[in-house]
Amino acid sequence: MEFAFYFAAGVAVLATLRVITNSNPVHALLYLIISLLAISMTFFSLGAPFAGALEIIVYAGAIMVLFVFVVMMLNLGPAVVEQERKWLTPGIWVGPSALALVLLVELLVVLARTPSGAGIGHTTVDAKAVGISLYGPYLLVVELASMLLLAALVAAYHLGRQDAKQ
C-alpha cells in the first residue's frame, strides 16, 4: 500500500511539473486533471475514500470544467485557434493518457488488495467525520479557499478583457 501512495505522489508531482512548465493552457489543463486524479489516488491509498471521491468529483470534474470555460472566455484569437488545432494531434494526448492509465491500474490494485478500504493509516475516514471537520474548526479555511477561487476567476476574466481592448 505504501508503494501505491508513493507512486501516486510521484505521478502527481510529475504532472504538476508539466502543468507549471507547459506554456499552452489547454495542455496544462490536461496535466492538471491528471495531477488531481493522482492526488485522489493518494487519498484512496491513505484510507480516505470519501476525500478521494470528493477530489475527483469537485476538483477533477467541476473546477476543471470551470477552468476550461475560463480558457475559452479569454478569446485568444484566430491565429492561436489555428495553432491549437495543429497542437491537438493524437501525440499530445500520449503523456496524459499514459499517466491516467497508470493511475487506473494503480486504483484497481489498491481496491483489489484492501477489501475493507483501509490504507496506510489502517483507518477509514467516513463522510460524517469530514463534514464535522469542514463545518467545524476548518470552516474559515473552506470559505477562504472558495473566495480565492472566485478571485482567480474574476482576475482571469479581467486579464482576458484587457488584452482584447488593446
From Swiss-Prot:
Keywords for the protein's UniProt record, in alphabetical order: Cell inner membrane, Cell membrane, Membrane, NAD, Quinone, Translocase, Transmembrane, Transmembrane helix, Ubiquinone
Catalyzed reactions: a quinone + NADH + 5 H(+)(in) = a quinol + NAD(+) + 4 H(+)(out)
Main enzyme class: translocase
GO molecular function: NADH dehydrogenase (ubiquinone) activity; quinone binding
Mode of membrane association: Multi-pass membrane protein
Gene3D superfamilies per UniProt: NADH-ubiquinone/plastoquinone oxidoreductase chain 6, subunit NuoJ (1.20.120.1200)
Superkingdom classification of source: Bacteria
GO CC aspect terms: plasma membrane; respiratory chain complex I
Subcellular location: Cell inner membrane
Residue stretches spanning the membrane: 1-21, 28-48, 54-74, 92-112, 134-154
EC assignment: 7.1.1.-
Quaternary structure annotation from Swiss-Prot or TrEMBL: Composed of 13 different subunits. Subunits NuoA, H, J, K, L, M, N constitute the membrane sector of the complex.
Entry-linked PANTHER family: NADH-UBIQUINONE OXIDOREDUCTASE CHAIN 6
Family: Belongs to the complex I subunit 6 family.
Function: NDH-1 shuttles electrons from NADH, via FMN and iron-sulfur (Fe-S) centers, to quinones in the respiratory chain. The immediate electron acceptor for the enzyme in this species is believed to be ubiquinone. Couples the redox reaction to proton translocation (for every two electrons transferred, four hydrogen ions are translocated across the cytoplasmic membrane), and thus conserves the redox energy in a proton gradient.
The protein's name: NADH-quinone oxidoreductase subunit J
Species annotation: Pseudomonas aeruginosa (strain ATCC 15692 / DSM 22644 / CIP 104116 / JCM 14847 / LMG 12228 / 1C / PRS 101 / PAO1)
Name of the gene encoding the protein in the UniProt record: nuoJ
